[in-house]
Amino acid sequence: MWKHVKQVDPEIYEVLVNELKRQEYGLELIASENFASLAVIETMGSMLTNKYAEGYPKKRYYGGCEWVDRAEERAIERAKRLFGAKFANVQPHSGSQANMAVYLALAQPGDTIMGMSLSHGGHLTHGAPVNFSGKIFKVVPYGVNLETETIDYDEVRRLALEHKPKIIVAGGSAYARIIDFKRFREIADEVGAYLMVDMAHFAGLVAAGIHPNPLEYAHVVTSTTHKTLRGPRGGLILTNDPEIAKAVDKTIFPGIQGGPLMHVIAAKAVCFKEAMTEEFKEYQKQVVKNAKKMAEEFQKRGYRIVSGGTDTHLFLVDLTPKDITGKAAEKALESCGITVNKNTIPNEKRSPFVASGIRIGTPAVTTRGMKEEEMEEIAEMIDLVLSNVIDENGTVKPEVREEVSKKVRELCERFPLYRDKIEGVEI
């Protein structure tokens, strides 16, 4: 593997090998990350990357599209079957571009949209001022009840009645509870708004049938294809409304994109096929079991979990009672081979670059085959590290760093990722 890269560009070869080592021997707990199968990776690295295919299957602006048409048709068919949708667009390069396409298809610049506040668990593209969504549209953010730390649906309704948004966005990047899509649709209908659900984080759970399917209530659904879906990096748009489908297709191409990434679209098709298996369903069940177990283990050790737990693949740990910042915790854990990300919490008092919490997700460690027993081990290691941080830069006592780094390596060696499947690379 990578022998041609090694010959042509030793510097990038070194990057590939060292990143492989980092993934193989480190604990990946970033909720938005996962490990794609070699089938997905091989497809992404194929000669399909050479082909331009502006347009849609059978309606291209270039010749020679017979085989890429077939790849995109398979991706569309499988996405529709997987999520029970009548229409699917598999061309978005990312989740952000999927969201942009829906906004521009259903609203005009200057129109009002509602989305969850970033500091309460939303996403940049749901109306953050620094993002295109916050610059192009008038944004009315909603949040969580500060006591329950779950979505305040009465407040969502009050804001919707007051501001009459064109689009209401449900979904987030750091919200651990199941969202009441029915309630959101009722609110949207009451004010004549479109309901858009961004299921990027929990799409894999939906595909496996262990999480409510937002398509039952949403006018349109967006997603990424990595994260819990465990596919290539990319976006997806689903709807049951033919008029919305037409508008979305025109907005993706020629509206905001040119040539689609055919190597990625083919890899999406592979990912969707993998997601139809019983093995994938069992995997998703274990992802949630692992998240619940790890959250419980943190609570046993005196940590506060935002909203008191999780229904999904992720949870937020409030570090305020431990007198450590999210930034320091992230650095401390990374020095021991454990990757998480700092994250704001509801009613955040610190900058997003410092934050008071960390977000933890179980998709990647579950892909390795880890179960509840290992979640207890991981929680114990994280607690040991965070209890031995000696400064605001996240420096860990040397003896603790050495001890935990060794334990992380041993745990990862018990659950190999790629090393027993890749030939020609010594790691």
Curated annotation (Swiss-Prot):
Entry keyword annotation includes Amino-acid biosynthesis: yes
Binding site for (6S)-5,6,7,8-tetrahydrofolate: 118, 122-124, 243, 351-353
Source organism, top-level taxon: Bacteria
InterPro entries assigned: PyrdxlP-dep_Trfase, PyrdxlP-dep_Trfase_major, PyrdxlP-dep_Trfase_small, Ser_HO-MeTrfase, Ser_HO-MeTrfase-like, Ser_HO-MeTrfase_PLP_BS, SHMT-like_dom
Reactions that this protein is recorded to catalyse: (6R)-5,10-methylene-5,6,7,8-tetrahydrofolate + glycine + H2O = (6S)-5,6,7,8-tetrahydrofolate + L-serine
Co-factor(s): pyridoxal 5'-phosphate
Keyword line: Amino-acid biosynthesis, Cytoplasm, One-carbon metabolism, Pyridoxal phosphate, Transferase
Signal peptide: none
One cellular component (GO) term of this entry: cytoplasm
BP GO terms, sorted: glycine biosynthetic process from serine; tetrahydrofolate interconversion; tetrahydrofolate metabolic process
Modified residues (N6-(pyridoxal phosphate)lysine): 227
Annotated pathway: One-carbon metabolism; tetrahydrofolate interconversion; Amino-acid biosynthesis; glycine biosynthesis; glycine from L-serine: step 1/1
Listed GO MF terms: glycine hydroxymethyltransferase activity; pyridoxal phosphate binding
Pfam families (UniProt xref): SHMT (PF00464)
Protein's cellular compartments: Cytoplasm
Entry EC number(s): 2.1.2.1
Subunit structure: Homodimer.
Function statement: Catalyzes the reversible interconversion of serine and glycine with tetrahydrofolate (THF) serving as the one-carbon carrier. This reaction serves as the major source of one-carbon groups required for the biosynthesis of purines, thymidylate, methionine, and other important biomolecules. Also exhibits THF-independent aldolase activity toward beta-hydroxyamino acids, producing glycine and aldehydes, via a retro-aldol mechanism.
Similarity field: Belongs to the SHMT family.
Protein name in UniProt: Serine hydroxymethyltransferase
Organism annotation: Thermotoga maritima (strain ATCC 43589 / DSM 3109 / JCM 10099 / NBRC 100826 / MSB8)
